[in-house]
Curated annotation (Swiss-Prot):
InterPro entries: Ribosomal_uS19, Ribosomal_uS19_bac-type, Ribosomal_uS19_CS, Ribosomal_uS19_SF. The gene is rpsS. Keywords: Ribonucleoprotein, Ribosomal protein, RNA-binding, rRNA-binding. Belongs to the universal ribosomal protein uS19 family. GO terms for biological process: ribosomal small subunit assembly; translation. It comes from the Bacteria. It comes from Orientia tsutsugamushi (strain Boryong) (Rickettsia tsutsugamushi). HAMAP family: Ribosomal_uS19 (MF_00531). This is Small ribosomal subunit protein uS19. GO terms for cellular component: cytoplasm; small ribosomal subunit. Transmembrane segments: none annotated.
């Protein structure tokens, strides 16, 4: 079930503070976060977030097309190694 519209998007306060601090200083550095559930807002465009996937931090460059989605959507948590090969010996 989706979040109701009247509540607005959820964004962790610490992320907004970190982005505002970078804007004021004029620097561009990677913002580390564990907040995969935070929505991407227009303020985040052109910043680089290091989103934790449960094992390591995945760098995500925010573009305008990503606005409205969640940070966790761009840091996959599972690694797909492919399906197991058929191990039956084929005789001729």
């Amino acid at each position: 079930m989706a979040r109701s519209i009247w509540k607005g998007p959820f964004v962790r306060e610490s992320l907004i503070k970190k982005v505002n601090k970078l804007i004021e200083s004029g620097k561009s550095s990677v913002i580390k976060t564990w907040s995969r559930e935070s929505a991407i807002i227009p303020l985040f465009v052109r910043f680089v977030f290091a989103v934790h996937n449960g094992n390591k931090f995945i760098p995500v460059v925010i573009t305008e097309e990503m606005v409205g989605r969640k940070l966790g959507e761009f840091a996959p948590t599972r690694t797909f190694y492919g399906h197991a090969a058929d191990r039956k010996v084929k005789r001729k």
